[in-house]
UniProtKB/Swiss-Prot annotation:
Keyword Nucleotide-binding in annotation: yes
Domain of life: Eukaryota
Tissue-specificity statement: Widely expressed.
UniProt gene name: CHD4
Biased composition (Basic residues): 113-131, 340-353
Any one of the GO BP annotations: terminal button organization
Crosslink feature (Glycyl lysine isopeptide (Lys-Gly) (interchain with G-Cter in SUMO2)) location: 133, 146, 179, 297, 304, 618, 696, 711, 1212, 1228, 1239, 1304, 1528-1529, 1565, 1572, 1584, 1606, 1617, 1636, 1643, 1647, 1660, 1670, 1687, 1865
Remarks, miscellaneous: One of the main antigens reacting with anti-MI-2 positive sera of dermatomyositis.
Acidic residues composition bias: residue spans: 35-45, 135-145, 311-323
Family statement drawn from the similarity comment of this UniProt entry: Belongs to the SNF2/RAD54 helicase family.
E.C. number(s) listed in UniProt: 3.6.4.-
Name of the protein in its database record: Chromodomain-helicase-DNA-binding protein 4
Pfam families documented for this protein: CHDCT2, CHDII_SANT-like, CHDNT, Chromo, DUF1087, Helicase_C, PHD, SNF2-rel_dom
Modified residues (Phosphoserine): 44, 303, 308-310, 319, 428, 515, 531, 1209, 1308, 1349, 1370, 1531, 1535, 1537, 1570, 1576, 1602
Origin species: Homo sapiens
Length: 1912
């Protein structure tokens, strides 16, 4: 490894640098690396002990300059001085310039006598800033003087002082190198000249060193070897220069023809032999020869290129630095190891030893190589080329080197281009002079490789004269018999160049061996001996390549050597990926039999087959698709840009007009015709085109020729010309589309899949074009997979239209934009980025087909074109108006829009609205209004109303409508048994996942999903598991053994039998599966059975997919089966030649299955289509099929906002239910498997398919009559048929249940199910594992204590019946849902007469087009919610109370309680209010959880408060009215007694004691109802400055409410959040003002007191009806025991007791105080509103419902509430005033109740404030204020009396009070942040809200009445 640090020297080119290096290093390197023959030469480059340079240490006194920079500068200065002194002639300069220019990687172009030139090469532009800076400095310092100045002259010129030091002998002995000298002298110069610039210091030091070396008296001593070498070098250079100037070059010596160069190479293992080396002139003895070292250069430390080096290198550098000279060093590596970083020790030590021996002669050398890698432009450890100045990292070479190569090495550039740099130097005069001086020539030691390029071994090698390659003569091909005479060029140098750039290698083959080489007879041979046998050549590989920019017509064969030389990377990659020993078979032509026949008939095809097709080139790639453009060259020849069929646009190529290509003339004619049509160009350049038969394109009329509103009765002539015929319904579609165009109505064509929407659209656009309505351009946006189909349809139906497909990568699209968008060259800016098209530019095409993605990606170009019409295929991509596609398309300039979709109502109305909004935003812009309009009406009305609105915009036909004669389709669900192997794996999967299954409440949805997927795999085939696949028996070719494969799966057993019969019947089959691995297994199965097949899955795209379809659909095709993956086999695939579809495993999403079987049931189908859906009996598959079917129903039948769009995901409960399905039976079987005589028992339920059953299954006539009548968009539901003969046992009892379609059963899940089923198996399995694994890991037992006490229930009763929905023996079970009446809602099972015995209705069902939840229809669900909002939580006896409103009276108690339980579970279910459904799939219907829970809480507080005082206050507010009412009733004996029932409470409830409220259904405990009586008492104690809070007798009269009262109360938002009521100061007024005050309430602004909960107001007539039917009942729920007792009490003064302990947080008590004072004084107890009225208001709310003010006022029991308003009855807005006052008053009471509850809880939790707390300090201040005010009350009176001193004191007191109050006010503002709040429930229970709700939503430990009811 050799070379210098830092950037190369400025005099690095040519001999100038060598001279400089000679002086610097005291050695003389040759001017050219090859001149080692010269005996006079001091050192041969190849034998130089390339010692590493010594690094210069940083000077402590000059820290500013980095070492590397300093070294570079020193070196550059010395270079200039020494170079200038050498007196080179102009020849050297010229030569140097030439070399510098020839090398594009030199570091500098500096030459003496000239200013430095900056190279223009691209690589130099990357020069770092530091380099540029240095070069600028160098330029500044560069002076043009030819003579180097002495140090004294330099210092004098600069005006600086010279040093006076006289060098002693000791100095000359010790300062043996420049480094030591510099360290000694530099401080002396710096001391004299402290401000000397670094560059000047370098120059002075250089001059001083030169003078010092010249004057050194010890030149011969070893101590001064370096100085001696330097002097010798100077002498030699001078002699060289003199010779150059004086002597002319010697004339060439005439030599006889010489042999070609040879050398003794060194193989990898060869020993090193000694060889003479003319190192020092006087030393003639030969020195041992060594392998020529490889130079490796370490990049400059100062540059950005980092040097990476190992520790070994660093050590070597350090050790070699001691002997290195000045600023250059060499690192050598000649070892066989190829690593430049870690060299072999042996070699290193050898080099060091040699260096030490020859230290007198050499101290290193400097090369003129670049110091950075040619490839990456970075520095570091680089490998130097021996034949040019380039350098490389080993990793940057291709292929990268692992180790440094041995000997001389040439870089890839030299190997490719030949040696130029070295050849130039060969002729340098310097070398010739040295050769002359040397005299004797020695054996040449050159740069040629030390080993054979072919076999990599040493020995005698033949060397090439123009490159470093060496060969054995026997390794050449053909071998040479002897060394040739004269100049010899190796195969690499004689290798012909390639004709272009290779794009890809297609195939390779063995070529013909070259002709053998004759061996000359030896001169001394016997003439009779036969001639020697000629040397045979070897066959070499030939590669068939495609050329860049050329078509496949130009593909040709090239030799391996050509590829290796010119395409190294591509060749290496090809070698890596392909077998290079055995050429690939050229069997690409497809069916051999067909191609053989065709070859016999068509000689042209035979030729093409021989030349191209057999090597993998498809015929389509050589067929012209269209000509895109033309160009004319200087000679007038025309070239055409051709786009080839089935190849992207970036493979388009230019071809000259006279190339022979099939149909070329036809396409040229077509190109010019189109050009003429679009631009009116007549003339065309080039040769005259041959006459070809081509239909002349007719120019479309300028004005419309046909009225588009007139219907076509038959298809027009221009369609007849295409050869196609439209179906009648397609003609109708065409007429409708044309009419809509004329009317300017944008439309949606929503025909069902398979009715030819693409054809209708193509014909519609063609008709616009042909009739002159529009010439386009038309934009079609479609899914990428269907674009090929669109191309075909346009080709077929619109032959005159120019259709461009704008798809592909950036390059393809750039070519399309340049050539296909316009005829004008500059219409669009070129390049890969899309840009706008010029406005005035004409458009070249009529139709542009593109994908959704490109609409947004290339919106710049597409958005700049004015489109006549937009067509969006599969338009449900526009269903979201927030999508980018929607927004971008909205910005396009579109005159007309047509959307195509097969499922316009796929999910919900919102999506339909977005489609309409896109079409006509001016009409459909209000989404909310649209949804509201269609939100709550039955389906039939909804569809009809929608139809009226959509009529002008949408056309939708179903196959059932338009093809009365189209073959029907029948879908049968075929239930299949698990094979024994599948059962084993099924049980194993369940057992292995026991812990995941058993984590009650905590089971992860993802883990359950994984279990389901594993079980689905098991149902398909056990070989889908790696373990089973490994153990499975295989055939020698690696395929599974067929019989074992079939036996392992129940489905394959059945499939085998079915396919056999289907094949015999001449049917063809599509088999769909979700899993591609299953398709692999099916391939093996079909191979085993010997059926031919095609396959499409997600990995097969575009053209390959279409080819497979075409092969299958081709007439007479042999393929019997087509394997498709369910999702990949979706859009745009037409397989109408098949008539049987087998869905091997159902997709999660039923839409995908429907799309799948629509592939066969479509236009073109002329046979009945049978669809067989395989479902494994009693497994997850069966359950998934049921759930998917029900979800599908829910999605389609309930066309309402929100529902259905997210039904794809399964809830945890659903997953758990799916997993449980059939497991009990599976494990039951296991128990009976022990006995051998269980066959008969098993047979009863196991499915058997014998020949008879298979025949019945495949019978195609079984359902024909029914299927033809299928109607409507729910056709897929009706097609779910059940093969009734499949199961031997049939449940006859379920036949009657046909009125209700069950969508989902109520979950009644046994939490211990998995525990009971799997615990034993799991523990057994763990024991087995432990036994097998030794001690193993401890298994933690999974015990769940949460739900342990829950009763066991058989979940199968309600949920997953062992027999699926499909085992019903009626095929009509799923049909005609819409025709059912709503009356027989619940199933009536035989023998079940009693309501109690009736089973609960299913959780979700559909009746008459409406969804029912547990038997509750939409109206009943709404009524239930209204009742909740009106009365709060239903009490235990709600079923017998006023709670049961009219709509709910038809429900049994069991159903009612079940629904209450479900409703409360939903309320407590965690999840967003925005979700469309609850976790169990029940529609949410806009339920707001917060509002409902708040209302329930408030009503509960009111009920509890009324119950507390009810037994004291009685049930009549004015007892005297009770008798009047009774008398009225007596006079109307026929009328029913009014019911006044309320929730039951024990009659002996004590005062101030909350009556117990029964626990809420479903285990939900509302906290308000479970508090203790101490709480209320505690809370009451906290009330301050209010009237007495014990029972108040009715004799007290309340004070009137004043006009200016203002109450601001926030509604209760939650338990913790209670706002303090703001109270405005009140003033007392006389009692007469009360009615006025009440009347003027409406004038008071009350912005805060707004009820956030919705108030549900029901029909008043309904209410009256209810009231007539009510029974007499107390508020506590009891009927009055003794009415006489009541009568006796009426004359006695009635006791009254009521209080709300709000702690003074509201103004309620101050109001009460004032009101009661007024009432007492005026004796108007009834007329002035006070505490008594408030109680009866709350009692009325409990009885009549929340905010039912009118009902309460009309009830005689609450007549007291009307008394205060009697004076206002004459006012017009009397009712409004009264209701407003009641609402405000109730708000205040509601707030007080909430605060009381909070205080009660605080007391219950023993919450108290710290005495030092700010609130307590506030309390103290308040006491001070109170004390101050009370103690100085007398001052007020005295001051009023005129006492002046008292007046002064009063002022002081008032000031004190004011200060105290302002302090308190400041404290109050800070108070809310500091008051301790009741911690939220979540904190107290240390559970998250989600966990609490989950626990509430689960069933309670003890059985609730609902559960009991369900079990009954």
């Amino acid at each position: 490894m050799a070379s210098g640090l830092g950037s190369p020297s400025p005099c690095s080119a040519g001999s100038e640098e060598e001279d400089m290096d000679a002086l610097l290093n005291n050695s003389l390197p040759p001017p050219h690396p090859e001149n080692e023959e010269d005996p006079e030469e001091d050192l041969s480059e190849t034998e130089t002990p390339k010692l590493k340079k010594k690094k210069k240490p940083k000077k402590p006194r000059d820290p500013k300059i980095p070492k590397s920079k300093r070294q570079k500068k020193e070196r550059m200065l010395l270079c200039r001085q020494l170079g200038d002194s050498s007196g080179e002639g102009p020849e050297f300069v010229e030569e140097e310039e030439e070399v510098a220019l020839r090398s594009d990687s030199e570091g500098s172009d500096y030459t003496p006598g000239k200013k430095k030139k900056k190279k223009l090469g691209p690589k130099k532009e990357k020069k770092s800033k530091s380099k540029r800076k240095e070069e600028e400095e160098e330029e500044d310092d560069d002076d043009d003087s030819k003579e180097p100045k002495s140090s004294a002259q330099l210092l004098e010129d600069w005006g600086m002082e010279d040093i006076d030091h006289v060098f002693s002998e000791e100095d000359y002995r010790t300062l043996t190198n420049y480094k030591a000298f510099s360290q000694f002298v530099r401080p002396l110069i710096a001391a004299k000249n402290p401000k000397i610039a670094v560059s000047k210091m370098m120059m002075v030091l250089g001059a001083k060193w030169r003078e010092f070396s010249t004057n050194n008296p010890f030149k011969g001593s070893s101590g001064a070897s370096v100085a001696a070498a330097a002097a010798a070098a100077v002498a030699v250079v001078e002699s060289m220069v003199t010779a150059t100037e004086v002597a002319p070059p010697p004339p060439p010596v005439e030599v006889p023809i010489r042999k070609a160069k040879t050398k003794e190479g060194k193989g990898p293992n060869a020993r090193r032999k000694p060889k003479g080396s003319p190192r020092v002139p006087d030393a003639k003895k030969p020195k041992p020869k060594k392998v020529a070292p490889l130079k490796i250069k370490l990049g400059g430390f100062g540059s950005k290129r980092k040097r990476s080096s190992s520790e070994d290198d660093d050590l070597d550098v350090e050790s070699d630095f001691d002997d290195a000279s000045i600023n250059s060093y060499s690192v050598s590596d000649g070892s066989t190891s190829r690593s430049s970083r870690s060299r072999k020790k042996l070699r290193t030590t050898k080099k060091k030893k040699k260096g030490e021996e020859e230290v007198t002669a050499v101290d290193g050398y400097e090369t003129d190589h670049q110091d950075y890698c040619e490839v990456c432009q970075q520095g570091g450890e680089i490998i130097l080329c021996d034949t040019c100045p380039r350098a490389y990292h080993m990793v940057c070479l291709d292929p990268d080197m692992e180790k440094a190569p041995e000997g001389k090495w040439s870089c890839p550039h030299c190997e490719k281009e030949g040696i130029q740099w070295e050849a130039k130097e060969d002729n340098s005069e310097g070398e010739e002079i040295l050769e002359e001086v040397g005299g004797d020539l020695e054996e040449e030691d050159d740069h040629h490789m030390e080993f054979c390029r072919v076999c990599k071994d040493g020995g005698e090698l033949l060397c090439c004269d123009t490159c470093p390659s060496s060969y054995h003569i026997h390794c050449l091909n053909p071998p040479l018999p002897e060394i040739p005479n004269g100049e010899w060029l190796c195969p690499r140098c004689t290798c012909p160049a390639l004709k272009g750039k290779v794009q890809k290698i297609l195939i390779w083959k063995w070529g013909q061996p070259p002709s053998p080489t004759p061996v000359p007879r030896p001169p001394d041979a016997d003439p009779n001996t036969p001639s020697p046998k000629p040397l045979e050549g070897r066959p070499e590989r030939q590669f068939f390549v495609k050329w860049q920019g050329m078509s496949y017509w130009h593909c040709s064969w090239v030799s391996e050597l050509q590829l290796e030389l010119h395409c190294q990377v591509m060749f290496r990659n090809y070698q890596r990926k392909n077998d290079m020993d055995e050429p690939p078979s050229g069997d690409f032509g497809g069916d051999e039999e067909k191609s053989r026949k065709r070859k016999n008939k068509d000689p042209k095809f035979a030729e093409m087959e021989e030349r191209f097709y057999r090597y993998g080139i498809k015929p389509e790639w050589m067929m012209i698709h269209r000509i895109l453009n033309h160009s004319v060259d200087k000679k007038g020849h025309v070239h055409y840009l051709i786009k080839w069929r089935d190849l992207p646009y970036d493979q388009a190529s230019w071809e000259s007009e006279d190339v022979e290509i099939q149909d070329y003339d036809l396409f040229k004619q077509s190109y010019w015709n189109h050009r003429e049509l679009m631009r009116g160009e007549e003339g065309r350049p080039g040769k005259k085109l041959k006459k070809v038969k081509l239909r002349k394109l007719e120019r479309p009329p300028e004005t419309p020729t046909v009225d588009p509103t007139v219907k076509y009765e038959r298809q027009p002539e221009y369609l007849d010309a295409t050869g196609g015929t439209l179906h009648p319904y397609q003609m109708e579609g065409l007429n409708w589309l044309r009419f809509s165009w004329a009317q300017g109505t944008d439309t949606i064509l929503a025909d069902e899949m398979g009715l030819g929407k693409t054809v209708q659209t193509a014909v519609f656009l063609y008709s616009l074009y042909k009739e002159g309505h529009s010439k386009g351009p038309f934009l079609v946006s479609a899914p990428l997979s269907t674009i090929i189909n669109w191309e075909r349809e346009f080709e077929m139906w619109a032959p005159d239209m120019y259709v461009v497909t704008y798809v592909g990568d950036k390059d393809s699209r750039a070519i399309i934009r340049e050539n296909e968008f316009s005829f004008e060259d500059n219409a669009i800016r070129g390049g890969k980025k899309a840009s706008r098209m010029k406005k005035e530019a004409s458009v070249k095409f009529h139709v542009l087909l593109t994908s959704y993605e490109l609409i947004t990606i290339d919106m710049a170009i597409l958005g700049s074109i004015d489109w006549a019409c937009l067509i969006v295929d599969e338009a449900h991509r526009l269903k979201n108006n927030q999508s980018k596609f929607f927004r971008v398309l909205n910005g396009y300039s579109l005159q007309h829009k047509l959307l195509l979709t097969g499922t316009p109502l796929q999910n919900n109305l919102e999506e339909l609205f977005h489609l309409l909004n896109f079409l006509t935003p001016e009409r459909f812009h209000n989404l909310e209004g649209f949804l509201e309009e269609f939100a709550d009406i039955a389906k039939e009305d909804q569809i009809k109303k929608l139809h009226d609105m959509l009529g002008p915009h949408m056309l939708r036909r179903l196959k059932a409508d338009v093809f009365k004669n189209m073959p029907s389709k029948t879908e049968l669900i075929v239930r299949v048994e698990l094979s024994p192997m599948q059962k084993k794996y099924y049980k194993y999967i369940l057992t292995r996942n026991f812990e995941a299954l058993n984590a009650r409440g905590g089971g992860n949805q993802v883990s359950l999903l994984n279990v389901v997927m594993d079980l689905k795999k098991c149902c398909n085939h056990p070989y889908l598991f790696p373990v089973a696949a490994m153990e499975a028996p295989k055939m020698p070719n690696g395929m599974y053994d067929g019989s074992a494969l079939i036996r392992a799966s129940g489905k394959l057993l059945l499939l085998q039998k079915m396919l056999k019969n289907l094949k015999e019947g001449g049917h063809r089959v599509l088999i769909f599966s979700q899993m591609t691995k299953m398709l692999d297994l099916l391939e093996d199965f079909l191979e085993h059975e010997g059926y031919k097949y095609e396959r499409i899955d997600g990995g097969i795209t575009g053209n390959m997919r279409q080819e497979a379809i075409d092969r299958f659909n081709a007439p007479g095709a042999q393929q019997f089966c087509f394997l498709l993956s369910t999702r990949a086999g979706g859009l745009g695939i037409n397989l109408a030649t098949a008539d049987t579809v087998i869905i091997y495993d159902s997709d999660w999403n039923p839409h995908n299955d429907i799309q799948a079987f629509s592939r066969a049931h479509r236009i073109g189908q002329n046979k009945k289509v049978m669809i067989y859906r395989f479902v494994t009996r009693a497994s997850v598959e069966e359950r998934i099929t049921q759930v998917a079917k029900k979800k599908m129903m829910l999605t389609h039948l309930v066309v309402r906002p929100g529902l259905g769009s997210k039904t794809g995901s399964m809830s945890k409960q659903e997953l758990d239910d799916i997993l449980k399905f059939g497991t009990e039976e599976l494990f039951k079987d296991e128990a009976t498997d022990g006995g051998g005589d269980n066959k008969e028992g098993e047979d009863s339920s196991v499915i058997h398919y014998d020949d008879k059953a298979i025949e019945r299954l495949l019978d195609r006539n079984q359902d024909e009559t029914e299927d033809t009548e299928l109607q409507g968009m729910n056709e897929y539901l009706s097609s779910f048929k059940v093969a009734q003969y499949v199961v031997r046992e049939e449940e006859m009892g379920e036949e009657e249940e046909v009125e209700r379609e069950i969508i989902k059963q109520e979950e009644s899940v046994d939490p211990d199910y998995w525990e009971k089923l799997l615990r034993h198996h799991y523990e057994q399995q763990q024991e087995d594992l432990a036994r097998n694994l030794g001690k193993g890991k401890r298994i933690r037992k999974q015990v769940n204590y949460n739900d342990g006490s829950q009763e066991d229930r058989d979940w199968q009763d309600d949920q997953s019946d062992n027999q699926s929905d499909y085992s019903v023996a009626s095929e009509e079970g799923d049909e005609d849902f819409d025709e059912r009446s709503e009356a027989p809602r619940r199933p009536s099972r035989k023998g079940l007469r009693n309501d109690k015995d009736k089973p609960l209705p299913p959780l979700l069902a559909r009746v008459g087009g409406n969804i029912e939840v547990l038997g509750f229809n939409a109206r009943q669900r709404k009524a239930f919610l209204n009742a909740i909002m009106r009365y709060g939580m239903p009490p235990q006896d709600a079923f017998t109370t006023q709670w049961l409103v009219r709509d709910l009276r038809g429900k049994s108690e069991k159903e009612f309680k079940a629904y209450v339980s479900l409703f409360m579970r939903h309320l407590c279910e965690p999840g967003a209010d925005g979700a469309e459904t609850f976790a169990d799939g029940v529609p949410r219907e806009g339920l707001s959880r917060q509002h409902v829970l708040t209302r329930i809480g408030v009503m509960s507080l009111i009920r509890k408060k009324v119950q507390e005082f009810e037994h004291v206050n009685g049930r009549w507010s004015m007892p005297e009215l009770a008798e009047v009412e009774e008398n009225k009733k007596m006079s109307q004996p026929g009328s029913p007694s009014p019911k006044t029932p309320t929730p039951s409470t024990p009659g002996d409830t004590q005062p101030n004691t909350p009556a117990p409220v029964p626990p809420a259904e479903d285990g939900i405990k509302i906290e308000e109802n479970s508090l203790k009586e101490e709480e209320s008492i505690e809370g009451e104690k906290e009330v301050k400055s209010t009237a007495p809070e014990t029972a108040i007798e009715c004799t007290q009269a309340p004070a009137p409410a004043s006009e200016d009262e203002k109450v601001v109360v926030e509604p209760p938002e939650g338990e913790e959040k209670v706002e303090k009521a703001e109270v405005k100061e009140r003033t007392e007024e006389p009692m007469e003002t009360e009615p006025k005050g009440a009347a003027d309430v409406e004038k008071v602004e009350e912005k805060s007191a707004i009820d956030l909960t919705p108030i549900v107001v029901e029909d008043k007539e309904e209410k009256k009806e209810e009231e007539e039917k009510k029974e007499v009942m107390l508020q506590n729920g009891e009927t009055p025991k003794d009415l006489n007792d009541e009568k006796q009490k009426k004359n006695i003064k009635q006791r009254f007791m009521f209080n709300i302990a709000d702690g003074g947080f509201t103004e309620l008590h101050s109001l009460w105080q004032n009101e009661e004072r007024a009432a007492t004084v005026t004796k108007k107890t009834y007329e002035i509103w006070h505490r008594r009225h408030d109680y009866w208001l709350l009692a009325g709310i409990i009885n009549h419902g929340y905010a039912r003010w009118q009902d309460i006022q009309n009830d005689p029991r609450y007549a007291i509430l009307n008394e205060p308003f009697k004076g206002e009855m004459n006012r017009g807005n009397f009712l409004e005033i009264k209701n407003k006052f009641l609402a405000r008053r109730f708000k205040l009471l509601e707030q007080a109740l909430v605060i009381e509850e909070q205080l009660r809880r605080a007391a219950y939790l023993n919450m108290s404030e710290d005495p030092s707390h700010p609130s307590m300090a506030l309390n103290t201040r308040f006491a001070e204020v109170e004390c101050l005010a009370e103690s100085h009350q007398h001052l007020s009176k005295e001051s009023m009396a005129g006492n002046k001193p008292a007046n002064a004191v009063l002022h002081k007191v008032l000031k004190q009070l004011e200060e105290l109050l302002s302090d308190m006010k400041a404290d109050v503002t800070r108070l809310p942040a500091t008051i301790a709040r009741i911690p939220p429930v979540a904190v107290r229970l240390q559970m998250s809200e989600r966990n609490i709700l989950s626990r509430l939503a689960n069933r309670a430990p003890e059985p609730t009445p609902q559960q009991v009811a369900q079990q009954q």
